Amino acid sequence: MAGLLKKIFESGKKDVKYLERKADEIIALADETAALSDDALREKTVEFKERVQKGETLDDLLVEAFAVAREGAKRALGLYPFKVQLMGGIVLHEGNIAEMKTGEGKTLTATLPVYLNALSGEGVHVVTVNEYLAHRDAEEMGVLYNFLGLSVGLNLNALSSTEKREAYACDITYSTNNELGFDYLRDNMVVYKEEMVQRPLSFAVIDEVDSILVDEARTPLIISGEAEKSTILYVRANTFVRTLTEEKDYTVDIKTKSVQLTEEGMTKGENYFDVENLFDLENTVILHHIAQALKANYTMSLDVDYVAQDDEVLIVDQFTGRIMKGRRFSEGLHQALEAKEGVTIQNESKTMATITFQNYFRMYKKLAGMTGTAKTEEEEFRDIYNMRVIEIPTNKVIIRDDRPDLIFTTINAKFDAVVEDIAERNAKGQPVLVGTVAIETSELISSKLKRKGIKHDVLNAKQHEREADIIKHAGERGAVTIATNMAGRGTDIKLGEGTIEAGGLAVIGTERHESRRIDNQLRGRSGRQGDPGVTQFYLSMEDELMRRFGSDNMKSMMERFGMAEDAIQSKMVSRAVESAQRRVEGNNFDSRKQVLQYDDVLRQQREVIYKQRYEVINAENSLREIIEQMIQRTVNYIVSSNASSREPEEDWNLQGIIDYVDANLLPEGTVTLEDIQNRSSEDIQNLILDKIKVAYDEKETLLPPEEFNEFEKVVLLRVVDTKWVDHIDAMDHLRDGIHLRAYGQIDPLREYQSEGFEMFEAMVSSIDEDVARYIMKAEIRQNLEREQVAKGEAINPAEGKPEAKRQPVRKDQHIGRNDPCPCGSGKKYKNCHGKEA
């Protein structure tokens, strides 16, 4: 252990030596840079950009670029970065975390690597915890970047897509972590590439990196939509399929558990829902509901595939016979079963896109961060983000007095002592910052101070701007500020006149937070830049942390020594508290790691789908090659399921193949039973694919190439998006329910990974099938518009159309089902005299 500590300590010393050497090289260029005129300094930016274009790396430019940015800061901001700030900037450029104490000028430090990396032209994101700080820093530091000839954008929640696109197109973009994540998700839901706002993710510098990558790591970003308002449609589809007769209206393939409507069944469906053509792209929602109702009624059996109990449908595991709690069939099949069994159809709000901050920020080519407190989470940053935490020495020696904890037996005794301490310090004009863990504690102390007539401000992290304003004045003589969970991070507390003589800022902690890092943040508000200051934590045996980690022995020890109301100040107790905090931090790290492991399953799937969408949206030419692969996979699956080369030919179900092809791929009769008899499985596949190729060629002639390309895009995007949203929702249910399966020695994560993979595979096959069906069967219309997948469209009965004068019907001519009826009614043949034919 001692050897390990020595190693870590020595590597830290090595880092500092290397950084000092590099910073000295930058400082050596100070006179040369200072001699340049403003225009010549600005010209340097153009020169650097050209050198990057010609192949020089950013590392090659670091010393010169930092020297230019440093001189620029002096001229534009009146601030001249210290040596330690140059060191911090180098750490950030290298994609690590610079731990810099409060008041050491992190915001200015970040300008150096941000300037350098913006020279690549790929865009740099500066990330803050709230919009107030993003706005403030973009405005203040933007003066420097503009002076040096770089553009600065501010990405706020209220901006329109066009404004966001402009902000992201700038060399440097300030934003909150939430907005970046949501923009990424929204970009992967758009249907035209022009609607995307972000550029590929290159370099991000995160301010308060521990807050974003650690504290918020367990919170996923979710875009949810209203669930389908199609309860009625499930019920109608269910009622409709129950009127159908097997063989006449539909066929069932037992092997693949699939059901196909026959021509007659389709006509009945079109009449029942009062639509002209079920395969029209406008009617995909109806067709989907009919397909699921058919599956629910004719391939799924109660008490075999699922059970209905307590007003819900629960899935039965086919292998173990156990109920799979929390799991729901995807793509609306579960709702179709609910309609079949007459239980409540569940349509809660639907997760349409989701990502965790961990996985979002890991997509950047390079990630860096800065904070005053990261050392305690060093292992997490290394394991999850591959970032090292490097401590940057302070510019001036810290002379703050950090006192050992004061421990009381009861919570009341503790609060009385806190208020006494505040009153004493306030009387001599010393500013006091009181840190609490909960809002109730803030309010309790506030009411006690009111009773004593002590003027004070309370911060509860609600209004960021007012918060920053209060924090600015928190260092003035006689100021008392109560802050919950260190609200007001990001704004310095500067000491006012006469406060240094009063002892500087006194920080009082009313209990220890479960994370040492948060305690250190509170401490770090005092003693900035060599100022005097004092910090004191007050604890009681009734505090939550003490209760959770067995302080009964300590409590009885204190009572035995007659310390019931007095405080003890003991290093032993402080050490016990710290070890309790370490245990909590360990638990929290494990839980964040677990969130990441679960999200990694979805991450891999998300990357596949988003990549496919991106290719479709950006495709300039026909997507036929991609679509033909999907058709081929579908045909392979149908043929091998019904005519496997591994089974004797007498067991083949050739009629099943014909039924599927007729219903989903080609006009009825294009492939007949005679065509595929006495052929091998491979020959059957090739025969069907050849016929499909001919039909595809014919389809392509119906529209000009650009319009046909657009038709292909519409089909692909609509199918992929519908299936993906359903899949995410199903994965959500699986994630929620996986822990309820407490049988055997199952590992929930392994179970989630394997089931999630199966569900993804099923979704991909389902995408193939639907794309094949719509491309081959949908009626092609001009001026098709891509639209974001809209759920649960209402089914409107057809508007009354004026009667057209009917013409006599000539029986001898061959009329296609979708041709206009020769009687002149204006309807399609199948919906008019075709019914009688």
Swiss-Prot record:
Location in the cell: Cell membrane; Cytoplasm
Biased composition annotated in UniProt, kind: Basic and acidic residues: 800-817
Catalytic activity: ATP + H2O + cellular proteinSide 1 = ADP + phosphate + cellular proteinSide 2
Membrane spanning residue stretches: none
Binding site for Zn(2+): 821, 823, 832-833
GO annotation, cellular component aspect: cell envelope Sec protein transport complex; cytosol; plasma membrane
Bilayer disposition of the protein: Peripheral membrane protein
GO biological process: intracellular protein transmembrane transport; protein import; protein targeting; protein transport by the Sec complex
Key word Chloroplast present: no
Keyword Zinc found: yes
Major localisation: membrane
Single GO MF descriptor: metal ion binding
EC code(s) of this entry: 7.4.2.8
Cofactor dependence: Zn(2+)
Note accompanying the cofactor annotation: May bind 1 zinc ion per subunit.
Chain positions recorded as ATP binding sites: 85, 103-107, 492
Amino acid composition bias (Basic residues), ranges on this chain: 827-837
Alphabetized UniProt keyword annotations: ATP-binding, Cell membrane, Cytoplasm, Membrane, Metal-binding, Nucleotide-binding, Protein transport, Translocase, Translocation, Transport, Zinc
Gene3D superfamilies: Helical scaffold and wing domains of SecA, P-loop containing nucleotide triphosphate hydrolases, SecA, preprotein cross-linking domain
One Pfam family this sequence matches: SecA_PP_bind
Region spans: Disordered: 791-837
Stated role: Part of the Sec protein translocase complex. Interacts with the SecYEG preprotein conducting channel. Has a central role in coupling the hydrolysis of ATP to the transfer of proteins into and across the cell membrane, serving as an ATP-driven molecular motor driving the stepwise translocation of polypeptide chains across the membrane.
Subunit structure: Monomer and homodimer. Part of the essential Sec protein translocation apparatus which comprises SecA, SecYEG and auxiliary proteins SecDF. Other proteins may also be involved.
Entries under NCBIfam families matching the protein: PRK09200.1, PRK12904.1, secA
Protein name (database record): Protein translocase subunit SecA 1
Organism: Listeria welshimeri serovar 6b (strain ATCC 35897 / DSM 20650 / CCUG 15529 / CIP 8149 / NCTC 11857 / SLCC 5334 / V8)
